[in-house]
């Protein structure tokens, strides 16, 4: 967001697993919020011009050498500050209080007893459940602070210094276990920080269009269109901002879901008027992969070949200065914070060549996935694109175990279409986070029409999840599974057996390879 007049509350990142959740909760209230490194200085914050600051929780102990610190001048900015868990301990410690290891650690839900009236807790009950997760606790509060809430193991569970607009809570209001946590965050954002609460997808669109037009001017923009949610939303947003200055390249590598390529062209090219160059590269990709069985080799070849195809097409265009990408805020957080952990790489189709000298445009890089979907809806995009499931860059090719053949690929494409059809008809489409079929490369004996068969076994994978980092298998109704199995076996050639994957993540990953 380039607009410094935008009301925003910044969250300083101290390593809590709930950091993103804090920003999401504030945004749900209607106030823009973003994570920043705990190394940010008071001077830098003054330039950003936020209306409030939240110090997140984290795994450190404030008294340990090398623990995450804060510029003490931040407390002198006159801005409202809310310290959560470690953030509260750090604020107390830096301002003259004491923090020690708790004699009895406090993990899980605990009753919070309010002892005084407080603007932070306005409209919440005197006794309420909150989520505690700490091994240290404040044992003496700084001068000017007073206690407004206690818990069985935390005599200073909630403290404040109203003269300096400083607030500290030992629990996590951002998680649902803290029953009235959202009300506390709303009180902080709207009443204490004075936000109007009018941040929305509608004004996000207006601001982005203004930013894009100012940045691009009369120059041209290139977009790699995959047909997924992120690149599709970027395409429609850019089309609204700069019209025919945008050119999209859509590479059909032959591993898309049934009807997907046609839908992309009809919806984005037809209804929304995007100028799309469709590259039919199915034979080119398949020729490189025939007979290969190692999943990493397949991924690498698909990624590299995609880059070569994209590069070939991009070089045919003249006068392109900008490259648009569907980078999300989660990508920025994972790669750009001091506390981020390295996670398993996603099934990306590969990076672009280093010698492609474009300026980047990433209009979604301040949004979470659910906000991208909301943006797509606000832009008038159909549900079948906005709610499209996560799909790996290499596509159906990595849902075929063993060597890749046209026959096996077709079993996955056709069975996947049946699975999606039946789950949609059952009304469970939004309840199941992701679902697909896999050709296991295992053949088994069967009987069909009094004839012995020896055909493929397909697996159905369906999971429930919030963010894909962890997942449980979806407990689909047995009659639905039976119907899906019957249809696949009857309608898809070379398949005679269906199994259901009931493994959670971890220990399994979502995809089979």
UniProtKB/Swiss-Prot annotation:
Species this chain originates from: Lactococcus lactis subsp. cremoris (strain MG1363)
Classification via InterPro entries: Class_I_gatase-like, GATASE, GMP_synth_C, GMP_synth_GATase, GMP_synthase, GMPS_ATP_PPase_dom, NAD/GMP_synthase, Rossmann-like_a/b/a_fold
Binding-site positions, ATP: 226-232
UniProt-listed NCBIfam families: guaA_Cterm, guaA_Nterm, PRK00074.1
Quaternary context: Homodimer.
Leading EC class: ligase
Domain GMPS ATP-PPase stretches: 199-388
Known pathway: Purine metabolism; GMP biosynthesis; GMP from XMP (L-Gln route): step 1/1
UniProt KW keywords: ATP-binding, Glutamine amidotransferase, GMP biosynthesis, Ligase, Nucleotide-binding, Purine biosynthesis
Record domain Glutamine amidotransferase type-1: where: 8-198
EC number: 6.3.5.2
Residues the record marks as active site: 85, 172, 174
GO CC terms of this entry: cytosol
SUPFAM superfamilies: Adenine nucleotide alpha hydrolases-like (SSF52402), Class I glutamine amidotransferase-like (SSF52317), GMP synthetase C-terminal dimerisation domain (SSF54810)
Reactions it catalyzes: XMP + L-glutamine + ATP + H2O = GMP + L-glutamate + AMP + diphosphate + 2 H(+)
Gene3D superfamilies reported for this sequence: 3.30.300.10, 3.40.50.880, HUPs
GO MF entries: ATP binding; GMP synthase activity
Function according to Swiss-Prot or TrEMBL: Catalyzes the synthesis of GMP from XMP.
Name of the molecule in the record: GMP synthase [glutamine-hydrolyzing]
């Amino acid at each position: 967001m380039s607009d410094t007049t935008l009301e925003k509350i910044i969250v300083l990142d101290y390593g809590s697993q709930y950091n993103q959740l804090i920003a999401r909760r504030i945004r749900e209230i209607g106030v823009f919020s973003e994570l920043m490194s705990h190394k940010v200085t008071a001077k830098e914050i003054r330039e950003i011009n936020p209306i409030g600051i939240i110090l997140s929780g984290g795994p450190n102990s404030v008294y340990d050498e090398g623990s995450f610190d804060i510029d003490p001048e931040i407390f002198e900015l006159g801005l409202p500050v809310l310290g959560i868990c470690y953030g509260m301990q750090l604020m107390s410690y830096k301002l003259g209080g004491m923090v020690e290891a708790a004699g009895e650690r406090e993990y899980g839900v605990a009753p919070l007893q309010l002892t005084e009236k407080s603007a932070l807790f306005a409209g919440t009950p005197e006794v309420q459940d909150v989520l505690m997760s700490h091994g240290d606790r404040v044992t003496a509060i700084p001068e000017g602070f007073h206690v407004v809430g206690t818990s069985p193991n935390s005599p200073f569970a909630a403290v404040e210094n109203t003269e300096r607009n400083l607030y500290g809570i030992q629990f996590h209001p951002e998680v649902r276990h803290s029953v009235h946590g959202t009300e506390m965050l709303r009180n902080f954002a709207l009443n204490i920080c004075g936000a109007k609460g009018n941040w929305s997808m509608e004004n996000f669109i207006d601001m982005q269009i203004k930013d894009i037009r100012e940045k691009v001017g009369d120059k041209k923009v290139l977009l790699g269109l995959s047909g997924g949610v992120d690149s599709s939303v970027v395409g429609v947003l850019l089309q609204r901002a700069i019209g025919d200055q945008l050119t999209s390249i859509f590479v059909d590598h032959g591993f898309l879901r049934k009807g997907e390529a046609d839908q992309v062209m009809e919806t984005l090219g037809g209804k929304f008027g995007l100028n799309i160059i469709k590259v039919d590269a199915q034979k080119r990709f398949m020729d490189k992969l025939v007979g290969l069985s190692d999943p990493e080799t397949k991924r690498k070849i698909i990624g590299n070949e995609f880059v070569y195809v994209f590069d070939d097409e991009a070089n045919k265009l003249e006068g392109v200065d900008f490259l648009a990408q569907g980078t999300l805020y989660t990508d920025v957080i994972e790669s750009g914070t001091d506390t981020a952990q390295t996670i398993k790489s996603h099934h990306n189709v590969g990076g672009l060549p280093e010698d492609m000298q474009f300026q980047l445009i990433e209009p979604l890089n301040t949004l979470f996935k659910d906000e991208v979907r909301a943006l797509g809806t606000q832009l008038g995009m159909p549900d079948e694109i906005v709610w499209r499931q996560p799909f790996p860059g290499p596509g159906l090719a990595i849902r075929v175990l063993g060597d890749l053949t046209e026959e096996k690929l077709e079993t996955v494409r056709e069975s996947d279409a049946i699975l999606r059809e039946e789950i949609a008809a059952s009304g469970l489409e939004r309840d199941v986070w992701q679902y697909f079929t896999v050709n296991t490369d295992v053949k088994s004996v069967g009987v069909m029409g009094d004839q012995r068969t020896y055909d493929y076994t397909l697996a159905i994978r369906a999971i429930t999840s919030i963010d894909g980092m962890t997942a449980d298998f979806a407990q689909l109704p047995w009659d639905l599974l039976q119907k899906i199995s019957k249809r696949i076996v009857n309608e898809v050639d070379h398949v005679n057996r269906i199994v259901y994957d009931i493994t959670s993540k971890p220990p399994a990953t979502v995809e089979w390879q």
